[in-house]
UniProtKB/Swiss-Prot annotation:
PANTHER family: CHARGED MULTIVESICULAR BODY PROTEIN, CHARGED MULTIVESICULAR BODY PROTEIN 5. Gene3D superfamilies: 6.10.250.1710, ESAT-6-like. Pfam families: Snf7 (PF03357). InterPro entries: Snf7_fam (IPR005024). GO terms for biological process: intracellular protein transport; late endosome to vacuole transport via multivesicular body sorting pathway; vesicle budding from membrane. Belongs to the SNF7 family. Residues 21-175 form a coiled coil. The lineage of its organism: Eukaryota, Fungi, Dikarya, Ascomycota, Taphrinomycotina. GO terms for cellular component: fungal-type vacuole membrane; multivesicular body. Keywords: Coiled coil. This is Uncharacterized protein C162.06c. The keyword Coiled coil applies. Residues 174-184 have a biased composition (Polar residues).
Length: 210
């Protein structure tokens, strides 16, 4: 069958906006180069016309300059169209990208809403309130337990007069022990506030043998 009717030509992939913009920019660059060359030719013709006397020669130069100028105008118009097309495609690309981002955001929001809806079915306000009450009960019980454990276990009723009498007895005993310790020390170890008495004696001079 393919031999009789032939094959369909392969389908070319559709160019993206980015590829189309790049192609337009390259064409614009090429046209700008051509316009620059025509400007250079016009400059040369202007010099030649200025240096040529009026007559057939100058008329021919002017005619050639007019042709170059006409080509320049055509290329300038073409360049303007290419730049406008490129600008329009850039705007379309930006709009397309913005729409993609918007759609992605909407899809994300829809998925989030779906998950929240699914999860909210498993959440009961009554269960949460009951759980909070239970937690509060546990905390209150723990606070009471800590309060009991923190009570002073050495709170014994003692008469203050007995404590004063015992303290006075301890002071008297300490004073008596101090006196006994002083009595047992030798006299030379006892502190004294008197100055020592020294015997001043004259030292005998040695006799000189005659």
């Amino acid at each position: 069958m393919h031999r009789l009717f032939g094959r369909k030509p392969p389908t070319q992939p559709t160019a993206s906006l980015t590829d189309a913009i790049d192609s337009l920019d390259k064409r614009s660059d090429s046209v700008e180069v051509k316009i620059a060359k025509l400007d250079a030719q016009l400059s040369v013709f202007q010099q030649k016309i200025a240096n040529t006397r009026p007559g057939p020669g100058q008329t021919a130069l002017k005619q050639r300059a007019m042709n170059v100028l006409r080509q320049k105008k055509i290329y300038e118009s073409q360049l303007q169209q290419l730049q406008q097309q490129s600008f329009n495609m850039e705007q379309a690309a930006m709009t397309t990208e913005s729409l993609k981002n918007t759609m992605a955001t909407v899809q994300t929001m829809q998925e989030t809403a779906r998950q929240l809806k699914s999860q909210s079915k498993n959440v009961s306000i009554e269960k949460i309130e009951k759980l909070q009450d239970e937690i509060q009960d546990y905390m209150d019980a723990a606070g009471e337990l800590n309060e009991v454990l923190g009570q002073n276990m050495t709170d014994i009723n003692v008469d203050e007069e007995e404590l004063d009498a015992e303290l006075e007895a301890l002071q008297q005993e300490s004073s008596w022990l101090g006196d006994q310790s002083t009595a047992e020390k030798p006299s030379y170890l006892m502190p004294s506030n008197e100055l020592p008495n020294f015997v001043d004696e004259e030292v005998a001079e040695p006799s000189t043998a005659q």
